[in-house]
């Protein structure tokens, strides 16, 4: 389960910057929330995923949103 969560975090962190490049902040946050929900439906731990991306979901600018996502990439999805 731990490896599945790590893999999900890494995949989401890789996907979001590409998928949300031209989006407004609220659109990007909505896309991130949908992606997290899909992984939770696939059996990942909701608490782990939500904790990993909470800083991004609570950000107030696009720059901080993408910075938080990039931080997850640098961590390699480790919690």
Annotate each language-model stretch with its function.
Residues 2-31:
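N-terminal acidic leader/helix
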Residues 25-63:
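Acidic, low-complexity, intrinsically disordered interaction modules
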Residues 11, 22, 33-35, 66, ...:
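General helical structural elements
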Residues 4, 55, 67-68:
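Generic detector of N-terminal low-structure segments
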